[in-house]
Amino acid sequence: MSYSVVVIGGGATGTGTARDLAMRGFDVTLVERGNLTEGTTGRTHGHLHSGARYAVSDKESAVDCMRENRVLHRIAGHCIEDTGGLFVQLEGDSDDYFERKLAGCAECDIPTEVISGEEARRREPYLTDAVERAIWVPDGAVDPFRLCVANAASAVEHGARIETHAEVVDLVVEGGRVAGVEVKRQGPNHHSEGAAGDTETFEADYVVSATGAWAGQLAAMAGVDLEMAISKGAMVVTNVRQLDTVINRCLPKGEGDTIIPHETTVLLGANDDPVDDPDDYPEEQWEVDMMIDIASEMVPVVADARMIRAYWGVRPLYDPNPKSTTDPGDVTRNYFVLDHAERDGVAGFASVVGGKLTTYREMAESVSDHVCEVLGVEEPCRTDEVPLPGSADPSALDEYMDEFDLRSPIARRSGQRLGDRAPEVLDIDEPNPTLCECEAVTRAEVRDAIDQVGADLNGVRLRTRASMGNCQGGFCSHRLGAELYPDHGAEVARDAVDELYQERWKGQRHALWGEQLSQAMLNAMLHATTMNHDANHVAGDENIEYRAFDGGRTAVPEGSHGD
């Protein structure tokens, strides 16, 4: 007998759960109110934890992280960059805590190497001279977008249905059990032509909430009280990659003391401040300034780096002992599977909460095991053994460089993104120009993404990184829109470009000084005037002097980052 399960949430845990259940033979439907990665997954800094960060304060989480770090290297190699990590001790930092960190890593089976400050600077020349010594650990960088999409693709390959832009507006509760979900369409997706505002009900034998920070709101639809310990964090993106190693400050408790190299950029962050509503919290300039100031204590060059955007995310923390602390930093990073039949008397419903991106697969396995136990299904988990799509043979990608007429850097970037899917995606019968020069994204990759998500350029961005470089879509958004025109028409293409451009603008608002301000005004010239997107730009008496914004570094005002 095939049981039906609805998974709510299109982040890493949700898509991982959909994959796991589909591989065990369940009839799975995943619903997500926006794009995949719309919530916490798409707003992390992509840190593949070794567990060392928690080796003193949260050993259970540390052990989970190291174990899953090894698993993800086996099944998702094309989503990971093996940067390694350094926990650096600066002058004045605690010797005692450094030794406790080493001992904690040993207890949690986390490999370490102690190196001198001189050796640390040899490996990473931009580190401050104040670094006295450091602990090397097997941290890394993981692409959360690629990882999430790969899980969704695998779920579909095993028969699952992925419904994006489908917001759950109610849980169907009958006779004391959750029997399905009611969704409201936010617009058409690749699997449904439903119009915005349409509603649809998906019946299910079991419903899993993998909604992270939104789990409390979802549970309330079934009359369940689930209190989350949500916290926010700001992250800042530089325009170039100053480092090749993940850098952490070796302190007992820190905010904003992590620097992560990712693709062509470096990410700084994040602070840890409690919020009540995951959809409504302040995003403030002082947070951006603080991230830059803290990071520059370890890597001074960051203070003068060009920042291209800032973004905020919320942590889906769960405290099994509510009100035990008011400091989010004290809340465990462990995860929990909450059986609402046992906990709240509402059957057919479970929430998976807490955890980290690094442990998403284990979280998915645990909640899938729970579903199997409740429904009497005896099928083992295989997600720790079966590689995700694109991960089977990443090394083979180099062979496609000449075959598909790609210049070396573009071939490398395309290969990293596509994994072993490169041959099927890049083998086209027409020219394959680069549409996004900043991130080296080709037409073939863009068209492949459009085939997956339809006329949704933000969905294309998540799958390819197009528009995520220095220009933030200024030079490529219209090219991406042009790829929609043949099948979707001019109006749809224009709307898609506008949505992409607005999303890109949102992240730039807190990074508008110096060279990035010049870039923003150049984008305004191109799109608002030359392309006439702002048809009324000459309606008033204002006369914008664009050259005034072209001062580069010398134009940075005193106080710099918005002080």
Swiss-Prot record:
Membrane topology: Peripheral membrane protein
Cofactor: FAD; FMN
NCBIfam families cross-referenced by the UniProt entry: glycerol3P_GlpA (TIGR03377), PRK11101.1 (NF008313)
Taxonomic superkingdom: Archaea
Consequence of gene loss (knockout): No visible phenotype.
Name this polypeptide is given: Anaerobic glycerol-3-phosphate dehydrogenase subunit A2
GO biological-process terms attached to the record: glycerol catabolic process; glycerol-3-phosphate metabolic process
Known catalytic reactions: a quinone + sn-glycerol 3-phosphate = dihydroxyacetone phosphate + a quinol
Compartments, as annotated in UniProt: Cell membrane
Family statement drawn from the similarity comment of this UniProt entry: Belongs to the FAD-dependent glycerol-3-phosphate dehydrogenase family.
Binding locations of FAD: 4-32
Subunit structure: Composed of a catalytic GlpA/B dimer and of membrane bound GlpC.
Functional description taken from the UniProt entry: Conversion of glycerol 3-phosphate to dihydroxyacetone phosphate. Functional analog of glpA1 required for the basal levels of glycerol-3-phosphate dehydrogenase activity, but not expressed during standard growth on glycerol or when glpA1 is knockout.
Disulfide pattern: none
GO cellular component, one term: glycerol-3-phosphate dehydrogenase (FAD) complex
Pathway: Polyol metabolism; glycerol degradation via glycerol kinase pathway; glycerone phosphate from sn-glycerol 3-phosphate (anaerobic route): step 1/1
Assigned keywords, A-Z: Cell membrane, FAD, Flavoprotein, Membrane, Oxidoreductase, Plasmid
EC number(s) reported in the record: 1.1.5.3
Originating gene: gpdA2
UniProt-listed Pfam families: DAO, Fer2_BFD
Note: H.volcanii contains 2 glpABC operons, one located on the main chromosome and the other on megaplasmid pHV4.
Entry-linked InterPro entries: BFD-like_2Fe2S-bd_dom (IPR007419), BFD-like_2Fe2S-bd_dom_sf (IPR041854), FAD-dep_OxRdtase (IPR006076), FAD/NAD-bd_sf (IPR036188), G3P_DH_FAD-dep (IPR000447), G3P_DH_GlpA_su (IPR017752)
MF terms (GO), sorted A to Z: flavin adenine dinucleotide binding; FMN binding; glycerol-3-phosphate dehydrogenase (quinone) activity
